[in-house]
């Protein structure tokens, strides 16, 4: 048998399904968590306003730091993924985004809080480009449409769930 014939193997449909499920699970989990993190800022803004005596302009600037960092580092996240792998960079970004919120909880002033939001935005910048890429590579043709719809739905679940849980917890626990 020739080397060319050895390279021509019939794809295993069970393996392809497993890859699809794994990619969709990772992408949906990351999207729910990251979008939940992102919308959690809206619950925290009035808390920070009260805690640090901030006006609306300062709150808007803080939100801009988070969103601007998130937006600005999406393309560099793609470059990092090409070098280190999308799943690795996505996992590290998710951890970094969560760490940004931990830092925010330790903030004793506005400058530290803004730095924490920068860290959170930096971590959050990995999700959209890398999770979308995982889905695009795992699903062929029109099958990617349903997968992307599921992925977007998962993000909306995160937007709804994390802020709601945080709002409930703030009733019984301090924000820190």
Predicted regions and their residues:
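Cytoplasmic helix-loop-helix junction between adjacent transmembrane helices
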Residues: 116-154
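Residue-level signature of mid-helix packing/kink "hotspots" within the transmembrane helices
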Residues: 39, 67-75, 160
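Conserved MFS/SLC helix-loop-helix module at the cytosolic interface between two early adjacent transmembrane helices
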Residues: 72-110
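Membrane-interface helix termini in secondary transporters
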Residues: 47, 78-79, 168
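Helix-loop-helix hairpin linking two adjacent transmembrane segments in secondary transporters
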Residues: 151-176
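Small-residue-rich segments within alpha-helical transmembrane domains of MFS-like 12-TM solute carriers
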Residues: 35, 39, 121-129, 160
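Membrane-interface helix caps of multi-pass secondary transporters
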Residues: 41-53
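Short hydrophobic/alpha-helical segments at membrane-entry points of transmembrane helices
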Residues: 27, 111-117
């Amino acid at each position: 048998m020739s080397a060319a014939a050895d390279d021509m193997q019939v794809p295993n449909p069970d393996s392809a399904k497993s890859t699809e499920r794994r990619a969709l699970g990772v992408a949906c989990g990351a999207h729910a968590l990251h979008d939940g993190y992102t919308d959690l800022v809206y619950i925290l803004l009035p808390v920070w306003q009260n805690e640090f005596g901030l006006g609306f302009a300062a709150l808007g600037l803080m939100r801009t730091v988070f969103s601007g960092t998130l937006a600005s580092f999406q393309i560099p996240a793609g470059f990092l993924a090409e070098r280190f792998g999308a799943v690795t960079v996505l996992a590290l970004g998710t951890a970094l985004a969560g760490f940004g919120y931990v830092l925010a909880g330790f903030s004793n002033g506005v400058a530290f809080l803004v730095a924490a939001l920068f860290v959170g935005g930096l971590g959050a910048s990995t999700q959209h480009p890398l999770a979308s890429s995982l889905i695009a590579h795992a699903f062929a043709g029109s099958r990617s449409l349903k997968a992307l719809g599921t992925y977007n739905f998962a993000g909306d679940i995160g937007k709804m769930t994390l802020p709601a849980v945080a709002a409930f917890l703030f009733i019984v626990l301090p924000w820190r």
